[in-house]
Amino acid sequence: MSFRLFTRTSQRLPRLNWVSPIRRYAKQPQYDEAELFAENINHGAYKAKKRPSDEHFQWPEKSPDQITKESELQWERMAKLSAVGQGILILVVVGGLGTAYLRWPELKSWWLIKMNGGRINATQEQSGQDSLEKLIRQKAKNLLREIPQVPAFQLGIDHPGVYIWGRCHSKDSLFPVRVPNLDGRKFRDILLAPSDDFNTNFAIDEKGDLISWDDLGQTKTILPDQDLTSMKYSSHFLYALNKKGEILVIPIRTPDLIASQVSSRRSKLLPWKTKLRYDWKLQTNQIFNGKEGEKRVVQFDAGSHHLVLLSNLGKAYCCATGNDQKQAQVSKGQFGIPTFSQFDEFPPNNQLFEIELLNKFKHEGEDVVRKREIKKIACGSYHTLAIDKTGEIYAFGWNRFGQLALPISYNLEYVSFPRSVTHAFKPHFPGMTNWKCVDIHCDDETSFVTIRKPGSTSDHHYFAFGNGLFGELGNNTFKNSQCDPIKIKSDDKKLTNWSCGSHCVFTETEQENEVIAWGNNDHGQLGIGKKTMKCAKPMNIPEVLKPGQDTTDLDSIYNSKLHLKKEQRVVTNGNKSCLYWRV
């Protein structure tokens, strides 16, 4: 009895000599389930259960409507599959025929060689050469069709007038064509049709009158007696600078509104003569500092919805363009004023504001605010560049494609205040500190900067940055974005008289006066005489066809170069271009 009690008690009490669970588990016998059930799995016979013979499976009965619908769906699926198969077959056949047509000489040569056991005889070799020569002749015929015949009685390039090429006369012209009814005329400035839906060109004639003209040369005077010198287009409005330093606001799409702003007055010296006065101008009286002698505008440029101008004291001002109605626009920083950022309300139209952060600066550690003199400004669609008298470059506005020479990022997509970007050019001039920027230009989404090295007046370097999808960068590459300035392949020639369109650029070499162009050429607006869609590096333009010239001599035409005279200029709007004589 005592032994049993001791045994039970010992079982309840914890053992002092504790054994680990791992060791205890290792001593227990181990079994594999495969061994336990292997006999049944490997040797057990499988017997399927059979349905009793007296039990028959009954398919569910369907109504006539269900049977009809299923039949219709089946036929519909078959019709779709048949249509897809026919479409694929047509594409394969058309693609095969097109490939065979384009590569017919190669296919013909391959077939002749195969039929001759892999050998080429003299007859087959001559046949291949004949096919190649036939293709060359066909290509030459196509080029001849694109070259216009200039009548012998027409005036040549030595006589003043206007030549136009690109998208004109409702078709594409690859070579400059002289515009009738404009022979013998010179102009102060020409602005080609500013948009696709408004196919009217504008010009400022010798007297400073604003006229409109179409591609056939039919002219119409819009605003006489204003002594205009230059003009820009923005937000369906025309902005023109006169010799007094005033900017006129001209709603070119609403002639009645123009007429309401015109009044007549008599001349003080010649009372029997009357002159027209135009009253709608950008108001500078309240914002210019007349006490310091700030009285007139000396230069201006415009983007899609903004305008930037320079006064005679080198101060920059900006305004929104268009009509007086509130625009459904969001600022992209193109005004250079932080209070007009993408988060703020769009500024009122045609009201000038000073760009104080561009006109003034303060050195770090100083309390004195200094004045900065701006020498030139240039506007893209939604961005602006500026250079001061020391050669520093400033940029503000839209930077999606790197057109501000700033890194492309979410925080720098819209820059609403002027930022110095001179440092972006330092890697191109290692060890040099006194190089400076001397010129700037912009097209819609690309910027161009001219840098002059120290101690030389002829050693210039040309850079581009921004959108280069159409070859605007001019370095033989196509890029959607480029924030680091890259050199334009200008062959060390000094370039002048720039004209930037939507996605193409014209310029002129200073010594030889050769016209070079690059960028988009989908309408032949570069004037190179070929249907090349894009040109990613500067190319020479063939000279203007002479009256009665033999157009069958293709080598003499395409190997020639257009040289401009001192008074000749080339301008473009991105779709077409023109050459004119400047007053």
From Swiss-Prot:
Species name: Saccharomyces cerevisiae (strain ATCC 204508 / S288c) (Baker's yeast)
Name by which UniProt lists this protein: Protein FMP25, mitochondrial
UniProt feature coiled coil, ranges: none
Major subcellular site: mitochondrion
RCC1 repeat start-end pairs: 332-389, 390-452, 459-510, 512-569
Keywords: Membrane, Mitochondrion, Repeat, Transit peptide, Transmembrane, Transmembrane helix
Transit peptide, residues from-to: 1-25
Family matches, as Pfam families: RCC1 (PF00415), RCC1_2 (PF13540)
